[in-house]
């Protein structure tokens, strides 16, 4: 009904096993990302990545360390072996950086985190969920300097402070690394697709809505 053919699905509220089953059952409709947990040991997280992303059908990992039972920052040195492995395997790394992202809502969303990670791991394409909001100018600056950062602000590009900055970036320098996110179920699918059509120029609309994600996740 909303014209959405393919969706990105991190395993936020379901297990990696169930996400894998969903991706395989609805083949071609969902791009899955394996979730890891900062409360796990490094070995446990590496095993998850190997099982579900390297040897399985999931396209990368999704990480929300601020939401864990052991809240940490994504640039904690503890996680560097995980990132090293993802870089070796050519996996996309998605990090929740924005919105309600940990006990300290400002510090856990600080774009200084991804700026450091993008510099330390230039071989990783970093996928920033929630677009680094509310640090809009700062995250866009990080994207300007680091071409391995991709963002999708989802609901934060609709009627939130800084929304126009996202839209200007998508229609300009960031048009090849900016992706649409519906914000569903917080926002209705049909309405967000309709509003996105009004936000983006004809030259970049297809990129933002599909082509950029297809390139990032190597979809054929």
Roles of regions detected by a PLM:
Residues 1-6, 173-179, 187-220:
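Mid-to-C-terminal alpha-helical segments outside catalytic/metal-binding sites
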Residues 2, 26-27, 56, 121, ...:
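A structural signal for short coil/turn segments at secondary-structure junctions
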Residues 5-6, 13-101, 105:
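Active-site gating/metal-coordination segments in enzymes
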Residues 12, 66, 131-132, 156, ...:
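Flexible loop residues that form catalytic
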Residues 17-21, 50, 115-116, 140, ...:
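Active-site phosphate/pyrophosphate- and oxyanion-stabilizing loops and adjacent acidic/basic residues
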Residues 19, 52, 61, 86, ...:
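Conserved, mostly hydrophobic/aromatic
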Residues 23-27, 53, 118, 143, ...:
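N-terminal cationic-hydrophobic initiation segments that often serve targeting/anchoring roles
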Residues 59-60, 73-179:
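Catalytic pocket-lining loop regions of alpha/beta-barrel enzymes
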